[in-house]
Amino acid sequence: MALTAEEKQEIIAKYATHEGDTGSPEVQVALLSKRIADLTEHLKEHKHDHHSRRGMQLMIGDRRRLLDYLKRVDINRYRSLIERLGLRR
């Protein structure tokens, strides 16, 4: 269920803005989106796992704040990211 090191490196390589980039909003949002997607699948099977549901809600809030920041700072990067990730906004 957790991200493996290989999966994490693939996501970082795909969304990095420059060499060695691991902390840009794009990378952080992409990693959170993968974790949220994995937890969503887990919760479909385990409906009463409220502890994981709470953790997922916190991750969704973190992602929302990062997206709001990116939208405020650079709207073009924001639009590009939500299109690449397939997010609704």
UniProtKB/Swiss-Prot annotation:
GO terms for cellular component: cytosolic small ribosomal subunit. It comes from the Bacteria. One of its GO terms (biological process) is translation. Keywords: Ribonucleoprotein, Ribosomal protein, RNA-binding, rRNA-binding. Gene3D superfamilies: 6.10.250.3130, S15/NS1, RNA-binding (1.10.287.10). SMART domains: Ribosomal_S15 (SM01387). GO terms for molecular function: rRNA binding; structural constituent of ribosome. Part of the 30S ribosomal subunit. Forms a bridge to the 50S subunit in the 70S ribosome, contacting the 23S rRNA. Belongs to the universal ribosomal protein uS15 family. NCBIfam families: S15_bact. One of the primary rRNA binding proteins, it binds directly to 16S rRNA where it helps nucleate assembly of the platform of the 30S subunit by binding and bridging several RNA helices of the 16S rRNA. This is Small ribosomal subunit protein uS15. It comes from Bifidobacterium longum (strain NCC 2705).
